[in-house]
C-alpha cells in the first residue's frame, strides 16, 4: 500500500497527508529498535503513545545537553523544529500516533 513505509526500526502508516498537516502511526514490532538521531528543519511533531513504551532522547539546542525520558502508554510528547531527537521502543509491538505540521520530506539524520 502507498500509505505504508517500511524502515529498519519498523513502519509508518500515513493516515492523513495534507499540504500543511500529516498524521501517522509509527509501529515498532521489536523492543530495542530505534529511529536514528535526526531533526526536522521546519516540521514540528506531537506524539501520543498508543501501545507499549518508548525511550525518547533529545538535545536541547539552547544548552547543548542530551535528555532522555520514558514514555509509557498514554504519554504525549511534543518536538519543536530543529530539535535533534531519537526514539527507541522499550517493548515489543510499541506504537504511537504522530501529528505534524507538514507532510514534506524534511528529515536530517545526525551521525553515521
PLM region descriptions:
Residues 35-38, 56-58, 77-79, 84-90, ...:
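Short beta-strand His + acidic residue motifs that chelate non-heme Fe in jelly-roll/DSBH
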Residues 27-28, 48, 70, 78:
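Residue-level "contact hotspot" at macromolecular interaction interfaces
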Residues 5, 86-112:
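Double-stranded beta-helix
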Residues 25-47:
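Short, well-structured hydrophobic secondary-structure segments
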Residues 41-61:
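Glycine- and acidic-residue-biased ligand/ion/polar-headgroup-sensing regions
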Residues 60-82:
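Short acidic-glycine-tyrosine-enriched beta hairpin
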Residues 46, 68-70, 84, 93:
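Well-ordered beta-strand positions in beta-sheet-rich domains
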Residues 1-25, 34-36, 69, 112:
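A short, N-terminal "cap"/entry segment at the start of jelly-roll beta-barrel domains
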Amino acid at each position: 500500500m502507498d500509505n505504508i513505509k517500511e524502515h529498519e526500526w519498523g513502519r509508518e502508516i500515513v493516515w492523513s497527508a495534507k499540504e500543511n498537516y500529516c498524521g501517522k502511526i509509527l509501529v515498532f514490532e521489536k523492543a530495542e529498535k530505534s529511529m536514528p538521531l535526526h531533526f526536522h528543519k521546519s516540521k514540528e511533531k506531537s506524539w501520543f503513545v498508543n501501545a507499549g513504551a518508548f525511550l525518547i532522547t533529545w538535545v536541547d539546542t539552547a544548552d547543548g545537553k542530551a535528555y532522555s525520558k520514558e514514555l509509557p502508554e498514554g504519554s504525549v510528547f511534543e518536538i519543536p523544529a530543529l530539535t535533534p531527537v531519537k526514539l527507541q521502543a522499550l517493548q515489543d509491538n510499541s506504537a504511537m500516533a504522530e501529528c505534524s505540521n507538514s507532510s514534506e520530506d524534511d528529515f536530517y539524520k545526525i551521525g553515521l
